[in-house]
Amino acid sequence: LTLGEFGTLYDCACTNVKVYVSRIMKLPTNLDSDGMNTQFFIFTLKDLRNAIAHNNVIFDTRFKTGKTDQRLVTLLEREVGISNIDFKYMDAYIIMITYFLRKMGETKNACKQFISSYQQQTEFLRNDLPISIYNQILGTQHKSNMLALQNFISKS
């Protein structure tokens, strides 16, 4: 069963099942009343997973096959405390993955290590590229996004 097939299977589930999954994951009901954010997460993650599986190294977000649902973006912005999350930059995927890892019970320490590893790689990139190109790849909010994400982990 591929992640895309799993997403399609989840899409076919009735609303009660989707709401039940959201409740298990402790997603806020005011931002996920119909349980659709888990589905949006699955399909957003699918593109990243496929890019990694087929291309190995991910440099930017050209792997996206569709638009990320605004409800998922709103959920992440409000829950994590980061404004203007944009899935044209890798930070958005790191934010989304970290958020859902915490919701699924991953430890704070493991999430901090995940972010630290990502930051280390982006620092290598920053040292090797002119700042204008670096900002085109990661956006100008990278540092503030990562600080806010670390703050979210500490509080969650």
Label every model-predicted segment:
Residues 1-155:
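Long, contiguous internal "core" modules enriched in hydrophobic/ aromatic residues
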